[in-house]
């Protein structure tokens, strides 16, 4: 037999193994290096979660799961978003309960029964849910390991691209509903691919176990209740599942397979509806069924509601977000799609348009399948005017499979490494990077022991930052002498007026009165001057580096000056009395 071009002599002939050639050793060394690289990046994924990451990507990471569950499970002070009020009920609560809720329940149980009290802290509340998502993210690695050979992809190159992507390191280790959507989409691909054979003549597969169809239907229903946009990702694999082995794929075969999926989907939907109805009901209201996906669609299909969250051009996903998340891999996918389109146009000129665009030609090869898995959801999501980059993170798995073919090396390796290093630095460290450490610092301040004779009231005012997740302060829900005020991107005059109103509270005006009032302002270095204009003396100031706010970016001249560190820091200023 042949190994890397060097023959192995026959033992029966009495010959020994020939020395492997230099090309073979290079290939073996390269494969081993890729495996070591994947192992190192996997370790980095876990360690960086524990460190923890300081970057604050988007408020939805906190306010669609841990902020709500911390209030429900631990009874701490939190800012509940409108989606989780019974009057709105736009988000299903089952996945937040399973991810953040289970983590917080274990923390509460440990604090009540464990030998070391005081385990619950801002750090534990931050890292606990993230660590669970990080563990679940390795299901992506297992899926790529399983999917790569039948998809014509190099297994270890695909795993290296997956583990080295900053999307995996940053987004798949956080409590976004998009993260759950990506995990469910990947498991859907595994179930479908294991029941499909590729080739010029696809034979109808033998009937699989009934649990597989039930599980497939359950995943589709769970994905829909998590985010109704999951259907955009599921349409291609479900079509492949419904037409596998069919001589004439059409409505009949799709309907037959849809009925097979129905029991699992119905059972899963019943669990979600029961959980949501229980969660959003109260003794004062009638116990009606709560259908959170219906409420979600009713809200988001209204253009005026979407406009409140920002409107984007229809090509934002294709022209901007794809490059922002995946860099050169998105460019490779565009190139592959263009080449496939050219082949299709040539075929249509020779055979006719209808035959060339038939289902058999669209899904005739794994590469065509991967292209559809990537571009079909992207096109469907582009129909909506609100387009954020994180909506595309479920596309990572089909993309890395598409960009790591067995017959070719991964191109642009240096560019891929540099792009993901910069992405991890920006979104994992710099972007709003001082806010989470700032909350940890303020947690220590407000929980510091004070003299019983002089109780202290704290006012924590945040301006020009993302919404502060209040559960990280670990404040009791009732009676906490701490007031958290989120001013958002307020004007300078409104900031000064608000500060004056806090310092003129009766308890703060009485010299030697019953309360000692401490006022803290949290602001980026680029907007610190607005606080100075309010004529309050600075009692002390703490800088947390790095912190980059793209809404108020530092000027280039300030970055080139000696004060660049101040402009790239979050400032926590304790104010004295107004002068």
UniProtKB/Swiss-Prot annotation:
GO cellular component: endoplasmic reticulum; endoplasmic reticulum membrane
Superkingdom in the source lineage: Eukaryota
Keyword Transmembrane included in the entry's annotation: yes
Keywords of this entry: Endoplasmic reticulum, Glycosyltransferase, GPI-anchor biosynthesis, Membrane, Transferase, Transmembrane, Transmembrane helix
GO biological process: GPI anchor biosynthetic process
Topology in membrane: Multi-pass membrane protein
Location(s), subcellular: Endoplasmic reticulum membrane
Pathway(s) where this gene product acts: Glycolipid biosynthesis; glycosylphosphatidylinositol-anchor biosynthesis
Disulfide bonds: none
Segments crossing the lipid bilayer: 131-151, 156-173, 180-200, 216-236, 258-278, 369-389, 391-411, 416-436
GO MF terms held by the record: alpha-1,2-mannosyltransferase activity; mannosyltransferase activity
Organ and tissue specificity: Widely expressed at low level, with highest level in brain and colon.
Keyword Membrane: yes
EC number(s) given by UniProt: 2.4.1.-
Function recorded in the entry: Alpha-1,2-mannosyltransferase that catalyzes the transfer of the fourth mannose, via an alpha-1,2 bond, from a dolichol-phosphate-mannose (Dol-P-Man) to an alpha-D-Man-(1->2)-alpha-D-Man-(1->6)-2-PEtn-alpha-D-Man-(1->4)-alpha-D-GlcN-(1->6)-(1-radyl,2-acyl-sn-glycero-3-phospho)-2-acyl-inositol (also termed H6) intermediate and participates in the twelfth step of the glycosylphosphatidylinositol-anchor biosynthesis. The presence of a fourth mannose in GPI is facultative, suggesting that it only exists in some tissues.
Family listed: Belongs to the glycosyltransferase 22 family. PIGZ subfamily.
Full protein name: GPI alpha-1,2-mannosyltransferase 4
Protein species of origin: Homo sapiens (Human)
